[in-house]
């Protein structure tokens, strides 16, 4: 069964120097699509797209070689999403099944066999979702998707939690941060959480269970950490960068560890305007271990992903792991949804609902 459908698509147009401007750096285009599956491939209907701050980093352009490819001009913007298979020429993916992975943010998409077979280090780029607990599909782009895998693999693979240790999680109400806070409490750690508003502070302390927290817009980061962790920090789960990273270094215990997940405060700044950390010599003085990562890295993915798949859906269904979502409706809201992550307009995981399951 063939035919062609109109297909509104979110397209990357040019690299911004600051916040991307809708209609200049991104655009919506109708890119009609054939409903015939390619050999060994799929046709999908996108259900919910996840949006993440690191996408701004990918807007540097395709000519920049980095941990993930930059977006190509005049090509669809991609990110971790969940979709329904509507045409299949691949026995592993029957029509009507759900798939998740790195998908184009468009109403419909073609998934070639090459993408199905591809891997990013230890992880496939596309995989089948079973949804055994009949959860809202948005969880599979958040707590059970990229955010959850990022938090789980790095927490158990790099943080290596020790009961009684003190961990500071910044951007603690973000999609990754909120999971790390809860995993740390499950493992008996003392959690200090920092956020950008009083509403988020209430959430991370009174709903997620952080021991203490602070609003960095009201209290300088370094001052707050000295107040809340006078004996220093064992672990920092770093999502923000900039002054937060500097404060992390100056408040670490000897042999402490900083796990660097991202630098969200710096993504929209030109290189010459990015924060200059001035206390790097404290790294050797305090014997600090700093480790960056991507969730699919061989050293953390292979040993942890099966436990994630077996445990997290159950915990989400039981309410043991909580999460918040800021959901936007319709592909036309993609720019607004994306910008909300940098302007304080989102809470938890930002998702874009495009179609019903």
From Swiss-Prot:
The keyword Oxidoreductase applies. Gene3D superfamilies: Medium-chain alcohol dehydrogenases, catalytic domain (3.90.180.10), NAD(P)-binding Rossmann-like Domain (3.40.50.720). Residues 1-22 are annotated as: Disordered. Disruption phenotype: Impairs the production of fusaric acid. Residues 1-17 have a biased composition (Polar residues). PANTHER family: PROSTAGLANDIN REDUCTASE, PROSTAGLANDIN REDUCTASE 1. This is Dehydrogenase FUB6. It comes from Fusarium oxysporum f. sp. lycopersici (strain 4287 / CBS 123668 / FGSC 9935 / NRRL 34936). The lineage of its organism: Eukaryota, Fungi, Dikarya, Ascomycota, Pezizomycotina.
């Amino acid at each position: 069964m063939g035919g062609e459908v109109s297909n509104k698509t979110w397209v990357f147009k040019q690299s911004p120097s600051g916040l991307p401007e809708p209609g200049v750096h991104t655009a919506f285009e109708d890119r009609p699509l054939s409903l015939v599956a390619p050999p060994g491939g799929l046709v999908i209907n996108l259900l919910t797209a996840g949006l993440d701050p690191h996408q701004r980093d990918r807007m540097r352009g395709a000519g920049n070689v980095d941990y993930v490819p930059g977006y190509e001009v005049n090509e669809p913007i991609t990110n971790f999403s969940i979709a329904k298979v509507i045409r299949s020429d691949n026995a592993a993916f029957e029509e009507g099944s759900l798939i998740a992975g790195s998908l184009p943010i468009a109403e419909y998409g073609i998934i070639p066999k090459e993408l199905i077979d591809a891997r990013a280090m230890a992880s496939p780029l596309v995989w089948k979702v079973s949804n055994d607990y009949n959860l809202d599909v948005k969880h599979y782009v958040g707590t059970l998707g990229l955010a959850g895998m990022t938090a789980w693999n790095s927490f158990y693979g790099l943080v290596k939690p020790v009961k009684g240790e003190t961990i500071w999680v910044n951007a603690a109400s973000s999609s990754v941060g909120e999971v790390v806070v809860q995993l740390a409490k499950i493992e008996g750690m003392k959690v200090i959480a920092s956020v950008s508003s009083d509403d988020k502070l209430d959430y991370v302390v009174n709903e997620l269970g952080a021991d203490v927290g602070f609003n960095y817009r009201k209290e300088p980061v370094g001052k707050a950490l000295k107040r809340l962790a006078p004996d220093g920090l064992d672990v920092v789960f770093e999502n923000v960068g900039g002054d937060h990273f500097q404060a992390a270094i100056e408040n670490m215990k000897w042999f402490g560890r900083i796990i660097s997940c991202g630098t969200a405060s710096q993504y929209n700044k030109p290189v010459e305007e990015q924060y200059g950390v001035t206390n790097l010599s404290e790294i050797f003085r305090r014997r600090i271990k700093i480790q960056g990562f991507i969730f699919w890295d061989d050293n953390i993915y292979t040993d942890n992903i099966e436990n994630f798949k077996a445990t997290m859906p159950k915990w989400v269904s039981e309410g043991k792991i909580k999460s918040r979502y800021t959901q936007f409706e319709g592909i036309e809201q993609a720019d607004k949804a994306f910008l909300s992550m940098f302007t304080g307009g989102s809470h938890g995981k930002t998702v874009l609902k495009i179609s019903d399951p």
